[in-house]
A protein has these predicted regions:
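Extracellular parallel beta-helix/beta-solenoid repeat domains
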Residues: 41-506
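Positively charged, low-complexity intrinsically disordered regions
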Residues: 4-6, 33, 250
């Protein structure tokens, strides 16, 4: 589930010559933003080093679980009625030895760990908690050492609805530490050093009303899945799939071996607010073939150094981004808290690059270039309609394609000091671009149609921002890099009311 562009050979050659990297391009300008960007979040969710302790005594009416008895938690869960509270004594709790042994909660169960309570999969059991029971709560418990397969998860393995995960430590597992169901709340928890994702928010069914708040999400993708399966798009801190309504706020997302937060395929109505996203090997945020989001008041720094540097060293001319909006935009016909993608009052400091708005001209419903195989836009219920001749005319010409449109980027502060980043080429970009449409042969989007649309016809705007450092701008396609004067002038007319200060930052 990744970018991808398909530049013809001639365009690639031009792009190699035109790419200017971090150097040059900006000039001082006098207009000032109408509203100053907000300050970084004042608190950081430092959950992993100092997790909140659970109760030292069993809550009233709770069933006590003994770590000295293998499988005690699963057995007592099975023999107790729904809505039972379980208190895990201090110590290392285990399941039985079959790899599929797991705890299958009943509706409304509550699991509370005492200080030092650990549920350990011993690198043998695949899953810790599974089943379809709704409204399960897990608090103050460490879950570690489980070996879920790729794309599967350890806690809430079956994506049941209404679970609450609070003050938990989910770490050192394979696969995803945590899956997600509708109305799930993940709060004040540590998702650390898991093999693929901290959380994989995927459900075969409705997944709405997700809250991810006040967590530390760090060090995930220890199994380096992008190297094992190049361009799989299957790793990072958190991956969201077809989530309708999510609040992601107040998290510390750092040091993940890949992307920090990645929403891929028909997500809608996201609020990404007040997070500190830093030091991730890849992008801080990817919002891909999705709709309607607010990204505000985040501090985003030192991201994409690893992936960006590797791409530049390999001669890739694509403007890799710290915030990457790929075939994603505002859509008034889809219900959400906004009908745009609004990116405002964020601080982006010393990342490999800035914000890229991208649209693959060859990626649309029924195209072999659509890496989200079988999926179509949320505007078309019958994918089979997106074929010739109907796709060449309204409304399907518009509705069969995920469009990067109605993106409003304002009141942000963009700081780049290339001596800090250590970049010498192909970094420090903002970008709005597409590729030259070529594929398949029945595509109605061939040529420069999509590049012209995303650049000038789909209401994508930067304005009232502050820039510090040698920023450049990629427009229309990867071969066209311009400086501030051209970016602000005809025909692009971007960053009205913005302030620019050349140099290497404060």
């Amino acid at each position: 589930m990744w970018r991808r562009r398909a530049l013809p050979a001639a365009a690639l050659a031009v792009a190699l010559l035109a790419a200017t990297g971090c150097d040059g391009g900006t000039t001082d300008a006098t207009p000032r933003p109408t509203t100053a960007p907000s300050k970084p979040p004042t608190s950081v969710a430092r959950v992993c080093a100092k997790p909140a302790a659970g109760p030292a005594k069993a809550p009233a009416g709770a069933v006590t679980v003994d770590p000295a008895v293998p499988g005690d938690l699963a057995a007592k869960t099975g023999s107790s009625p729904p809505h039972t509270t379980f208190w895990l004594r201090p110590g290392r709790h285990t399941l039985l030895t079959d790899r599929y042994d797991q705890v299958i909660p009943k509706e409304g169960n509550v699991y509370v760990g005492a200080p030092g309570a650990v549920l350990d999969g011993r690198e043998s059991n695949h899953y810790a908690f599974g089943g379809a029971a709704p409204d399960v709560t897990i608090r103050h418990l460490t879950v570690r050492g489980f070996v879920a397969p790729r794309d599967e998860g350890v806690v809430n393995h079956d994506s049941a609805d209404g679970w609450v995960i609070e003050h938990a430590m989910i770490r050192d597992n394979s696969g995803a530490g945590l899956m997600a169901g509708a109305r799930q709340q993940v709060r004040a928890s540590c998702l650390r050093d898991n093999g693929q994702y901290g959380m994989n928010a995927y459900k075969d069914g409705d997944l709405s009303g997700l809250v991810v708040e006040g967590n530390e999400i760090t060090g995930n993708n220890t199994d380096d899945w992008e190297r094992q399966r190049p361009q799989c798009g299957c790793s990072g801190g958190v991956k969201f799939w077809a989530v309708n309504g999510a609040d992601v706020r107040g998290n510390w997302v750092h040091g993940n071996h890949g992307t920090g937060l990645w929403a891929d395929t028909n997500n809608n109505d996201f609020l990404i607010e007040g997070n500190l996203i830093e030091d991730n090997a890849g992008a801080a945020l990817i919002y891909e073939i999705s709709y309607n989001a607010v990204v505000r008041n985040n501090t985003i720094r030192r991201n994409d150094w690893v992936d960006g540097r590797a791409s530049a060293a390999g001669g890739d001319t694509f403007p890799f981004a710290t915030v990457y909006l790929s075939e994603s935009g505002g859509e008034p016909r889809i219900r959400a808290r906004t009908d745009k993608i609004e990116v405002y009052r964020n601080v982006l400091e010393n990342n490999w690059s800035g914000i890229t708005l991208w649209e693959n001209a060859d990626r649309f419903c029924n195209s072999p270039a659509n890496t989200s195989s079988g999926d179509c836009t949320l505007l078309v219920k019958d994918t089979g309609r997106c074929v010739r001749p109907a796709i060449a005319e309204a409304p399907l010409y518009s509705d069969c394609r995920w469009k990067t449109q109605r993106v409003d980027i304002h009141e942000n502060r963009f700081v780049l000091d290339k001596s800090v980043v250590g970049c010498t080429a192909r970094c420090g970009h903002m970008a709005v671009l597409s590729n030259y449409g070529t594929y398949p042969d029945w595509s109605p989007y061939q040529g420069e149609r999509v590049a012209e649309a995303i650049t000038g016809g789909q209401h994508n705007r930067w304005h009232d921002n502050v820039y510090v450092g040698p920023w450049t701008f990629v427009v229309h396609d990867a071969s066209r890099t311009v400086g501030v004067k051209q970016w602000r002038g005809t025909p692009y007319r971007q960053d009205a009311g913005s302030a620019f200060r050349a140099g290497d930052g404060d």
